[in-house]
Amino acid sequence: MLIKFQGKTPQVGDKVFIAQGAKVIGEVELGEDSSVWFNCVLRADFNFIKIGKRTNIQDLTTIHIWHREPNDKGYPTIIGDDVSIGHNCVIHACEIKNRVLVGMNSTIMDGACIEEDSIVGAGSVVTKHKKFPPRSLILGNPAKVIRELSQEEVDFLKISAQNYVEFKNAFLKESSVTQKPIF
């Protein structure tokens, strides 16, 4: 469901799938071929969320921002192309670059940045303002770099995202859900 908030309507690219029960609120931009799965909440009420092409946000994930205030520009949430966000994650006011896999039940906090071609392992907690280099395997609570990813692991990241493009295409073929904004 697309929900307009304070004059901002979510912007949805071509061939995007938003599953039943998902809520996309306010200043959200969803790139072409992306998918937002069942019971996700993307709430861009007082800052923006931008999601790139071929990115999948899996079931029960929450994506939010840090509010803009008079003396604080806050943090938007920016997610790149070919990103897979696993089930039941919390992605809060951070940046995730291209070709990243965030494992199930992970949390990424305000001001953190995951550089391209990286994996955040299931259940990891990336704390505020933490920055990780490209090609990192990131695990733990608090999360830390365990090692650099192999080329085979990096290649898998794009395959994972492409699998979800195919899954969402199958759902789009059979789905009777309307994607019209709610005013």
Each language-model region and where it sits:
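Terminal amphipathic alpha-helical/low-complexity segments used for targeting or macromolecular assembly
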Residues: 1-15, 130-136, 141-183
